[in-house]
Design a protein with these regions (language model features):
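Predominant activation on well-ordered alpha-helical scaffold segments within soluble catalytic domains
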Residues: 57-60, 140-143, 147, 199-202
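Short strand-loop junctions, especially beta-strand C-caps/beta-turns
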Residues: 47, 125-128, 189
Length: 239
């Protein structure tokens, strides 16, 4: 399935150039067995409305244009991460589609929930309807479905996960808590609320590192920069 729509805009500022350089750094490979290919999984967090989906759409598009195999996964109940890539059209979510398939007595396949546009593979985990369930539990269920579909065997260079960062919930913190990603990128701005969320994410990474986790914070992407330098000062203070 390839929905119609225009190309997403491309950001060319120095901040994105630095971000691409960070993302290109290969993590330490496991030594248990010979590795022929290693997928780098990057989770992106930030407060609602800060521009995570916009940032990821452009980042994934540019990576694909450089010849990388990229999978973009929306991990927000709003299910709007991939809409920019598909011209404003919403992709069927994993949770919704798996429920329909189960009721029909059919098996869920990767072709039901994974779509491609401009070289980027994309999917949405989805979530429950408002007032009808737990968004964090929906994320956990979505990843359980990905496991059944062989998520870790897919041949991608990068997997980008778009997470909501406003809530303190185990489901939304899954990549950090379970070492599902190698790096975390925080999208923020110079306002106090976005930096508060950024600090919470950094604190979560630090907490799980003390418990033996290996996830690191790659950096802070400053969106809607008003020139005050608050986000830059925060990034320097947390290292």
């Amino acid at each position: 399935m390839t929905p119609e729509g225009g190309h997403p805009p491309i950001l060319t500022d120095n901040g994105f150039a630095r971000l691409r350089e960070e993302a290109a750094i290969e993590p330490d490979l496991p030594v248990e067995s010979e590795v022929t290919k290693h997928t780098q999984i990057i989770a992106i967090y930030g407060k609602g409305g800060i521009g995570k989906s916009f940032t990821l759409s452009n980042l994934s598009y540019m990576m694909a244009q450089q010849g990388k195999r990229v999978l973009l996964i929306g991990c927000d109940p709003k299910s709007d991460t991939t809409s920019l890539l598909f011209g404003g059209k919403a992709c069927p979510t994993i949770i919704e589609t798996s429920t329909k398939k189960k009721l029909a007595g059919e098996e869920l396949t990767i072709g039901d929930v994974c779509f491609k546009r401009d070289g980027v593979f994309a999917m949405e985990l989805g979530g429950p309807e408002v007032g009808r369930g737990c968004g964090g539990r929906g994320i956990i269920h979505g990843f359980e479905q990905l496991e059944k579909l062989g998520f870790h065997d897919w041949d991608f260079d990068y997997v980008l996960l778009d997470f909501l960062g406003d809530v303190v919930c185990g489901g939304f913190g899954l990549p950090i808590a379970r070492d599902m990603c190698q790096k975390v990128i925080v999208v923020g701005s110079n306002d106090l609320q976005s930096l508060y969320v950024a600090n919470n994410v950094c604190s979560a990474v630090q907490y799980f590192n003390k418990l033996g986790g290996n996830v690191g914070v790659a950096g802070l992407v400053v969106n809607k920069d008003d020139g005050s330098g608050e986000a830059q000062a925060f990034a320097e203070s947390v290292g």
